[in-house]
Each structure stands twice: as C-alpha cells, then as structure tokens.
Amino acid sequence: MQAPPPEHCPGVESEQAGKGSACAGCPNQGVCSDPNKKLEDPGKALVVESMKDVSNKLLILSGKGGVGKSTVTSLLTRYLARSNPDSNFGVLDIDICGPSQPRLMGALGESVHQSGYGWSPVGIEDNVCLMSIGFLLDSVDDAIIWRGPKKNGMIRQFLSEVDWGNLDLLLLDTPPGTSDEHLSVVSYLKDDTNPESLRAVMVTTPQEVSLLDVRKEINFCKKQNIPIVGVIENMSSFRCGHCGNSSEIFPAKTGGAAAMCAEMGIPLLGSLPLDQQISKACDSGEDLTEFKNVTTEALEGICSKIMASFS
C-alpha cells in the first residue's frame, strides 16, 4: 500500500479492490487492481500488534441464520470460563448489523471506555470480557445500515484498537454466510507462522436447509486453510419437562449433522437440545452453566474437545 486507504476502502483482499466507488481517485487504485501484485493491508500490522497477547482465536460459524450460533457462542464462553478459572476468555461480536452478545451475556446498557491502550472491553466475569458494536449504539433499537467497507473498517478497529490484554482464547461470533465480514476477519487473524492459532467451529440444526449452507461454510474454511475443530448440532431434540420424553422438533431427514460430518470428514463435537431454561436465560442474560442439566452435560463434552484442539 503506497498511500493511506480512503474511508470506505474495500480492502486489498476484497474482489472489489481497486474497482469500488471508494477507489476512484485513490493513489493506490492501479496497484490494488493488479492481480499480479500481492499487497498487505496496512491494518494487518496494527492487528498483529494488538492481538499479540491473544493466544488462540475461535470463529463460531454457520451458513444459515437462526440456528443459534450466538447462543452457542455465549454458552461455550460461559462454560469454558467456569471450567477453566485460571484462563482468560474474550468474546468479539462481529455480527455488525445484528449484535446479540450484550443481551446474551447480561451486559445490556453497558458502554466501553477509552484507555491509554484503546477501547476497554466490557467485563462479564473475572475471566471473561466482551466487545460488541451494541455497546456503541445510543439505543438497542438503532439500525446499522452500513455497506461492506464500513463494516470491515469497524472489524479492523475491534481487532486493532481494543485492549484485549492477555487472553487464552478469543471467541468470535460471526454473521451468517461467507460475506465481507468473514473475509476481513480471516485476512486479519490468519497467522502464517502459527496457522493453528485460528480455528473454526460450525453450528447447525438437523434440517437439510441448514446443513446445505454449513457445507458451504466448511468449504470456505478449507479454501482459507482454517482448521475446523468440528460441528455442533443445535436444537437436536426437545425433552418434555413434564413427561421426560424426547421429541425431534426439527427432524433430520438426511441424517443430520452426523451424516454430514461423516461425508465431509469433520468431527461432530456434540449435540445441544432445545432447552426452555436456556431460552429464558438468553433473554435475561443469566448464566445457567453452573446448573447440572442435559445442556451442561453436552457442553462439558463439547468444550473439552475444543480446549484439546488448541493444546
């Protein structure tokens, strides 16, 4: 990069590099549009410096919206923090247009503060911190109507201007699909000297309509050379609180996550049921991982596999 990027720069990794409307008049336009010249985004060095004390990063992905990815992110974080009290965990909500983590983590109404090292993330527990664009809005009902370049710029700020401190694991709650946000965060966090430090977990429900998009997400990770820890099947069954019988609310017509994992050679980390207690806790921001139930039993196995993948 020969000159500072314009405000709405699509990024050198984007297919729109040198072609977008923001590129008109930029001194770098000719360089960015040349496929034979590999460029390094100047923001990458800032991210590397800011994240130097973050040991591992875990992308929580799903191709389909509404499969409970944000809920799973909060549950994993809570359980990991409770079962590993000597480790530090962070959550970065990069679903810019639909931030859910402030509510799920019981931090609605909190705000971030500026320190000498950048934005200070919101403390959730002694060993858990959270950053989300939700903390920067005047109202929880405010709509964020941004194009890709502006969202990418916000993600770059979250990675380079937040004082994360020493973290053993940073979990990133991502939007559905394989959009600009995914390309940006991967380009900033991939470390060729330590490729195992960035990994991914897929979240799906048993229906084929969800599995179809998760397959695309898996192929995205393979193309980007991101190791996949495994797949979590969410909402796999519902256990009645009165009779104790289990029902499949979303039947696995094509074999569910287990069949897909076998087909694509990806580990199945476990399955999480539909749980009324968890549903209520998500709305109130409570932490229910301290209680023993079918969900926390499943989380125990899933979280142990995740931690083992980074050891």
Curated annotation (Swiss-Prot):
What the entry lists under CDD domains is as follows: Mrp_NBP35
Q: Indicate where this protein resides in the cell.
A: Cytoplasm
InterPro entries, per database record: Mrp/NBP35_ATP-bd, NUBP1/Nbp35, P-loop_NTPase, YlxH/NBP35
Q: Where does [4Fe-4S] cluster 1 bind?
A: 9, 23, 26, 32
> Which UniProt key words apply to this protein?
4Fe-4S, ATP-binding, Cytoplasm, Iron, Iron-sulfur, Metal-binding, Nucleotide-binding
Q: Specify which residues bind [4Fe-4S] cluster 2 according to the UniProt entry for this protein.
A: 240, 243
Keyword check for Nucleotide-binding: yes
Answer yes or no on keyword Electron transport. no
What would be an example GO MF term here? metal ion binding
Q: Which PANTHER family match?
A: CYTOSOLIC FE-S CLUSTER ASSEMBLY FACTOR NUBP1, NUCLEOTIDE-BINDING PROTEIN NBP35 YEAST -RELATED
Instruction: Tell me the function of this protein.
Output: Component of the cytosolic iron-sulfur (Fe/S) protein assembly (CIA) machinery. Required for maturation of extramitochondrial Fe-S proteins. The Nubp1-Nubp2 heterotetramer forms a Fe-S scaffold complex, mediating the de novo assembly of an Fe-S cluster and its transfer to target apoproteins.
This one is known as Cytosolic Fe-S cluster assembly factor Nubp1 homolog
Name of the gene this protein is made from: Nubp1
